[in-house]
């Protein structure tokens, strides 16, 4: 199995631009024979999305970009990180797996690291189960 471990610098907190770049790099990996392309944590937004996550319109833009990436996935699996909201207003730092045009799995980060700013704990809820 050939894996593509993709590092790239997100275009700030622009989910649409980041989704376009992820899709471009994903397609390049698939063309080069990768069976799975793996992108970083919060690849869709950048790790410093912070206060933007409190805005519903921003969360909706992120969700739309996730749906777009899932729909564009093919035989090569696509793994990437993005913030997603549940139906009760909680936001999770998620690891997503898509293939064949579908979002097949979403894992919510269980353990939120603590940094001096308390960043992860201010903006994300911890997941409740290993999945």
Model-derived segments and spans:
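Enzyme catalytic cores with a strong preference for nitrogen-chemistry domains
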Residues: 1-131
